[in-house]
Amino acid sequence: MPSKRTLAQHLSVGIITVANAYAQLAVEGYITSREKKGYFVEDVSSYRVRRKAAAAMLPEAAEREYFADFKANRISLQNFPLATWTRLMRETLSVHNEELLKTVPYKGVYELRKAVADYLAHNRAMQVDPSQIIIGAGTEYLYGRLLQMFGHACTFAIEEPGYKKFASISASFGNPWKYIPIDDNGLMIDKLEESGADVVHLSPANHFPTGIVMPVTRRLELFEWVNRIRKRYIIEDDYDSEFRYTGRFILPLYAQDTQSRVIYMNTFSKSLVPSLRISYMVLPPRLLDRYEQTMSFYSCTVSSFEQYTLARFISEGYFERHINKMKNYYREQRHKILAAIHASPLAAISQITERNAGTHFVLHINTRLTEAEVRKTALAADMCLSFYSDYSHNTEENNGCTLVINYAAIEADKIAAVIERLSSLFPECNQIS
């Protein structure tokens, strides 16, 4: 190679520029420096480098917007207190400017865990220490940590129908699982015993999609099952439990547990907004040491900025006020959409199952159409429907079709038009009208 000075003069550039270029080539192994002799090029002729074509920019399909979307993960967005949330974000930047630059504790920031513990004490009768609470970006992440902690030798039980995603997460971790049928009182304990499962996942306060509330007699049977063998546990998913329109909240299993066997799970994605990927689990004291010893190397997956903001949103009372506001809104939505169905041709060919809780109900329609035909017709009519079978692994064809009507995201002024279009999907309604 020419000397640095010679090459600099030849290219009319500074010698420092050439020196930096030579140094980079030397670091990458293309040239070597020999004392008092200069730079020599390494023999790399045996390596052929093929020029790669520029990566094609593939268009990303935007999520389709429907005239009516009854999917279960939709909520009313226009009621979110954005101005309050924005103000708290600004205050978080001001108050916690130094903490925001530090590593987030693996369980989550203390302020949020303390706020959640206080909320659970006041609204769920749960006596929880902040050290028992683990914050994560979505329940899927937290379920993954539990599956990993329990290990492949542990068999899980899942309600049928129920939260199918838990089965998918179990499969991805290589954990075996069993589906357990439900009856009018919830998960059937005799079938759970027969399954040989070690850990059961269920939603006793508001089963999805049926809305069944597990009565105290069935709860006592469940506690008998879990207390019979030391390695058994219950994962209680309290999703959507805030929206109960009559009476007080349903007491969680965690609050009734005397043997430290219940793991409590909940999320803010339904009560606030889906984009706020903050969920939490409460570990019973007997599992806390095990989690800390085996899972503490995982970093917290939620930014401290969002955690501090949510902590203030809860501790200053905004969260509870928002829940009360949304309960009133969803109660009115439920009333309007049920009234619209009763006033439509659907009333003559359908039966409604609703439990005065959550943001959905079940609508069974007596039709000659198959579910596949209804799905196809609905999409053509710009409607996204949710079917009861979507939450069951049993794909056996039944008479008629059963819909899960999640009305949270249906705009109030569109309800009449939405039900009219839903009715038009079924030829039986057209004959009535």
Where are these regions (language model features)?
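N-terminal basic, amphipathic alpha-helical segments
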Residues: M1-T92, L101, R286, S296-S303, ...
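Active-site PLP attachment segment
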Residues: K36, A255-R290
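Conserved core of the PLP fold type I
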Residues: E99-R230, E242, R248-S260, Y330, ...
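Helix-loop "lid/cap" segments that line or gate small-molecule binding pockets
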Residues: V116, Y280, Y308-S315
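Residue-level detector of anion-binding/catalytic polar loops
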Residues: P176, R232-Y233, M383-C384
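Catalytic cores of nucleotide-enabled group-transfer and carboxylate-activating enzymes in metabolic
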Residues: L251-P252, E292, L310, I341
